[in-house]
A protein has these predicted regions:
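A Zn2+-metalloprotease active-site environment signal
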Residues: 1-213
Length: 213
């Protein structure tokens, strides 16, 4: 697919840019809370790889390897709170092992709401989209709701404003219809989803206020 080819041609690790440093700082703040939320019975070895590229994508693998494109932050002009919304959502997909039973057991969960499964394993060092990509299917609506709910809780615990989860989806939905937003084909930024997050805020805002830095 075009997205995969694009990802492969643009997969350049970025460890030095201001955007990369911001992503990694947010990731480090969320990590202890993701560890607390881990009920899989196996400790995760969380690791964030930042790729330089315009693609709007981020993903996590069961086990804790994560990746995010700088384009996500730069094109959507994400605040740190909004970056936390994206990372928290992906961490929750990985923690809940969504799609773990996909082909070969090797699974990438992506912000695209896609489960990308490779038959012969995924190169763990370059958490890229493997050439052996076999299947890509959307998460179920239920899994997406679970990832939203878990993600906003991680945000609040780490002192990020959970309201930012709403603004991320609003920014995405404004871009809907643009062909470069592959993630929205499987991950509609719909009103139902935004309303569900809004209903969680009364419980989460006090947690955020307490942990705000």
């Amino acid at each position: 697919s075009q997205v995969v080819q694009q990802a492969q041609s643009q997969r350049v690790l970025d460890n030095t840019s201001h955007t990369s440093r911001r992503i990694k700082a947010v990731f480090e703040r969320l990590k202890p809370y993701a560890n607390q939320a881990n009920q899989t019975g196996t400790p995760f070895n969380w690791q964030m790889n930042v790729f330089r590229g315009d693609e709007l994508n981020a993903w996590a693998m069961p086990g804790g390897k994560m990746a995010m494109y700088t384009g996500m932050v730069e094109r959507l002009k994400l605040t740190d709170d909004e970056i936390a919304a994206v990372i928290g959502h992906e961490m929750t997909h990985a923690l809940l092992e969504h799609g773990k039973k996909a082909i070969g057991g090797q699974v990438l969960t992506g912000l695209g709401g896609s489960i990308l499964a490779g038959a012969s394993g995924v190169d763990a060092n370059i958490v890229g989209l493997g050439t052996d990509l076999l299947a890509s299917k959307p998460f179920s609506r239920h899994q997406e709701s679970e990832a939203d709910a878990g993600g906003v809780r991680l945000m609040a615990q780490a002192g990020y404003n959970p309201e930012a989860a709403i603004s991320v989806w609003e920014k995405m939905s404004k871009l809907e219809g643009s062909s470069s937003i592959a993630i929205l084909s499987t991950h509609p930024a719909n009103q139902t989803r935004i309303n569900a997050i809004r209903r969680m805020l009364p419980e989460l805002m006090p947690i955020y206020q307490k942990n705000k830095r």
